[in-house]
C-alpha cells in the first residue's frame, strides 16, 4: 500500500526530472531504473556480506578492492550508493558519470550475455550535478519510506508509480 507521503515523494522525483530538462517519460523511467539498480546492487551486496558473516562463510563483494574501468582504477567502495550518496554534488556527479555508470554497464564480463547486450547502449542522461544530488536524496527518502511500510507489495506499487508520469496528471 502506497501512502500519500510516499506518492508525494515519487511525484517530487518526477518533478525533479521534468524541471531538470528530462521530459521524455521513457528517458525518465530508464534513468530511474538505472539508479534503482545501482542502489539495489549496493543493498544486495551488503545483505550478502551480513549473511556470509552470520554463517561464517567468505564473501567476495563486487565492490571489493580496486576496480578497473578502461585504463583507470578506483577503490570499489567508491562505487557504492551508500558511499557516493554523501559526496558533494559535483563529486557525486563525476563519480556516477565516470565510474559508477561504466561499472554497471560492464558488470557482466561476457560481452555476449543478455545483460551486456541490454546495457551496452545505456547512457547516463542526468544533465547536472545538482539534479543528480536532488534525485539521489529523493530516492533515499523513497527507499526509507518503503522500509518503514514493509508491505510485500509496496515495491511493485512504487515501480508502478515510477512509471506513471504523475506531474502531468
Across the structure, where does each feature detected by a protein language model lie?
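Non-catalytic, mostly N-terminal accessory regions of nucleic-acid modification and defense proteins
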Residues: 1-164, 168
